[in-house]
Amino acid sequence: MKLDGSIAAVVTGGASGLGEGTARALAAQGVKVALFDMNAERGEAVAAEIGGIFCAVDVTSDEDVAAGFAKARAAHGQERLTVNCAGIATGQKTVSRKREDGSLRAHDMASFERTVRINLFGSFRVLSQSALGMASAEPMADGERGLIVNTASVAAQDGQIGQAAYSASKGGVYAMTLPVARDLSSEGIRVNTILPGIMWTPMMAGMDQKVQDALAAAIPFPKRLGTPADYASLVLHLAQNVYINGECIRLDGAIRLAPR
């Protein structure tokens, strides 16, 4: 896929973090970008800066996702690239003790379900609706109709203590990559997944610098946190290399997460 002004893209979670970095990188190539996010103020600002459009979308809502694609396609035409970056990170042990009195409690099921609903169901909802549109488009070079890039996490393979819900949600994204790529192969639609390691995102900004430095020191090489630019660079490569399909790629500086 040649990334230029003939290509339209949708980036979920595009108002911040990995999604924003990807949206900016695509726009720099001339790609017409639609941002799906719930943060309207930030999303509108980023869209204005990159010459894209913002669509207020909650990925857990069928109606929001359908309306977002309708708005994006009306403005830019059928997207050929969709990047799923919307997601949340949560932490709670399967069974834990309260610090106050040592009493036991089980993992909150509402929190578990919400994590899976956003990270896994949300990714598949966007993926399937984008693929539906791509399948109706005319093939490009090599017979390709489009590419969908999902975001899992190294926690899908190296889940830490307290990451049962998060690892399950990202593990689902990881596990569905190959079967979905096979499902869509006859339509000329590729599907790949990126498993980011410890990345600098707005969630990191509130952490003490010493904590950030310690996290960076644990990474074999390069000894720094990953950046949205690192992620975006891989998205661009996946778009341009048509032979990469059905793959889950770790982007982590060779780190393997310890139990805690």
Residue ranges and their predicted role:
Residues 2-34, 180:
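Canonical Rossmann dinucleotide-binding motif of NAD(H)/NADP(H)-dependent dehydrogenases/reductases
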Residues 227-251, 256:
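C-terminal substrate-recognition "lid" of short-chain dehydrogenase/reductases
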Residues 185, 190, 244-247:
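Short, small/polar-rich loop/turn modules that mediate ligand/substrate recognition or access, typified
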Residues 127, 169, 177:
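Active-site helix of classical SDR
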Residues 77, 89-113, 132, 136-142, ...:
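Conserved mid-core segment of classical short-chain dehydrogenase/reductases
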Residues 132, 181-183:
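Alpha-helical segment proximal to the catalytic Tyr-Lys
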Residues 153:
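Residue(s) in the substrate-gating loop at a strand-loop-helix junction
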